[in-house]
């Protein structure tokens, strides 16, 4: 990728250098050719990697500098100078927008099939691709109702699913803090049967979808029952293991102690202006607000230690309006049996019947892809002993390991 980037960047800068030699000859054909070729190639470099923006900025600086030098020339009237300026701006903006949008339009049109790395995109984006997630989500019910079996995906940032298993939080953490010793709730980065939850209305005692169904709407109060362990999603005034300023999230176990269940959650559909008040699979982006505390269910980004199987921490946070508190239903089916063992078999063995794919417009895909290109490189970058911050660079307060001996501890900074 770097070789392609360098090719476009170097050829683009060469064209701009050629343009500088004829910068005052607006009626000359070479003036137009070199400017358009230069901006086209530098925009292609930007399409390859965002670091190509630096080459484009350099070219724009040279063009602006040359125009500044044209202003004192007595042979050029104010009208001619204004024409020079307007044509430069028009060509630069139109070429950049046309080339950039065309490249990504071709990219998104041709690459219509699922691949091994599409999990970084949102569920809606994945479901619009042929194969992969689309083959699972096609044909599944749209409206989330009482009795729906769902997987909840963290919508933005790291791809992971709300998860629980039969293991408990440790009684005490290494820093001396105590936990609730309730069932762990995490965000797991892989598909797993323990990612399934059942939506339940508090006033109902069964978990079966009835006819007519009871769709969940914006503002409704629900319980989330873990599909395998049958314990409800819960939060309470106990510090989270890795983020003590937030509340712990667990699945409630009744130990007959003075810690009653607080397992009611309010559904907030954040994009209801586009999808409506009813909670929809794939399309609706939701927040789950803990009724007792008004805290939001949130992916904290912290990784749990060995006792949490190195999965990611889920907390309840008082700051509701943040992207890490947004979730969406990815896989969805209706519960048909009240028997727990039968439900477990359905969760493990069920397959959806493909009917039609989720569709996204070009602009929806384009915007999401740009956001992922900007921020996905920051995900999964863990701190290590040789890491440094930009403020360390000019002061040289931290060293960089250039060479380490394989036979001894000798190293060079």
Indicate where each model-derived feature is located:
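Residue-level signature of transmembrane alpha-helical entry/exit and packing/kink sites
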Residues: 2, 31-38, 84, 88, ...
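Transmembrane helices and adjacent periplasmic/lumenal helix-loop junctions
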Residues: 3, 36-63, 98
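Specific aromatic-rich, kink-prone transmembrane helix
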Residues: 4-27, 34, 38-41, 66
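Hydrophobic membrane-targeting alpha-helices
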Residues: 15-19, 47, 56, 60-64, ...
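Juxtamembrane interfacial secondary-structure elements that flank transmembrane helices
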Residues: 23-24, 67-72, 105-117
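Lectin-like carbohydrate-binding module/patch detector with strong preference for beta-trefoil
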Residues: 108-368
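Membrane-interface anchor segments at the N-terminal boundary of transmembrane helices
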Residues: 385-388, 400-413
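Hydrophobic alpha-helical membrane-interfacial segments at the cytosolic entry of transmembrane helices
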Residues: 40-41, 63, 74-106
């Amino acid at each position: 990728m770097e070789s392609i980037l360098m090719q476009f960047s170097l050829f683009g800068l060469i064209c701009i250098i050629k343009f500088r030699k004829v910068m005052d000859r607006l009626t000359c054909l070479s003036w137009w050719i070199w400017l358009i070729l230069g901006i086209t190639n530098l925009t292609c470099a930007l399409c390859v990697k965002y670091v190509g923006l630096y080459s484009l900025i350099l070219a724009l600086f040279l063009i602006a500098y040359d125009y500044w030098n044209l202003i004192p020339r007595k042979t050029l009237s104010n009208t001619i100078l204004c024409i020079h300026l307007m044509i430069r701006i028009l060509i630069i903006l139109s070429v950049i927008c046309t080339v950039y949008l065309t490249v990504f339009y071709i990219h998104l049109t041709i690459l219509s099939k699922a691949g091994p790395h599409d999990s970084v995109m949102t569920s809606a984006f994945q479901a619009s691709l042929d194969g992969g997630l689309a083959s699972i989500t096609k044909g599944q019910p749209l409206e989330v109702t009482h009795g729906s079996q769902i997987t909840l995906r963290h919508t933005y940032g790291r791809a992971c699913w709300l998860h629980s298993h039969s293991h408990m939080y440790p009684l005490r953490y290494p820093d001396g803090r105590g936990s609730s010793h309730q069932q762990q709730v995490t965000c797991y980065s892989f598909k797993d049967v323990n990612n399934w939850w059942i939506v339940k209305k508090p006033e109902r005692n069964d978990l079966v979808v009835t006819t007519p169904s009871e769709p969940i709407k914006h503002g409704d109060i629900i319980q989330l029952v873990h599909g395998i362990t049958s314990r409800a999603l819960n939060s309470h005034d106990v510090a989270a293991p890795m983020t003590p300023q937030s509340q712990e999230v667990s699945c409630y176990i009744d130990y007959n102690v003075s810690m009653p269940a607080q397992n009611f959650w309010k559904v907030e559909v954040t994009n209801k202006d586009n999808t409506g008040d009813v909670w929809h699979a794939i399309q609706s982006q939701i927040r789950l607000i803990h009724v007792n505390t008004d805290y939001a269910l949130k992916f904290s980004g912290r990784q749990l230690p060995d006792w949490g199987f190195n999965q990611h921490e889920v907390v309840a946070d008082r700051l509701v309006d943040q992207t890490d508190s947004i979730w969406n239903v990815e896989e969805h089916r209706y519960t048909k049996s009240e028997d727990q063992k039968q439900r477990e078999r359905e969760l493990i063995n069920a397959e959806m019947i493909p009917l039609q794919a989720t569709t996204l417009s070009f602009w929806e895909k384009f915007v999401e892809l740009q956001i992922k290109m900007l921020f996905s490189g920051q995900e999964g970058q863990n701190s290590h002993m040789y890491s440094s911050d930009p403020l360390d660079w000019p002061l040289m307060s931290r060293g960089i390991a250039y060479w380490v001996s394989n036979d001894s501890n000798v190293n060079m900074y």
